[in-house]
């Protein structure tokens, strides 16, 4: 089983992020998308909002999980 981690702030998630997630879901058996937080950076959305957005955008990919 192959797996990969795709970390990022995803503030907000973009089409480029989704493209990487789509390609990663085809290349790996399991893809973990990790919503990162940097206290030195200002954000448009909270980590929970970004998690919710990414979860909704990736819900059709059975092998993709989104985490904080």
Predicted regions, residues:
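Nucleotidyltransferase catalytic core that binds NTPs
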Residues: 1-68
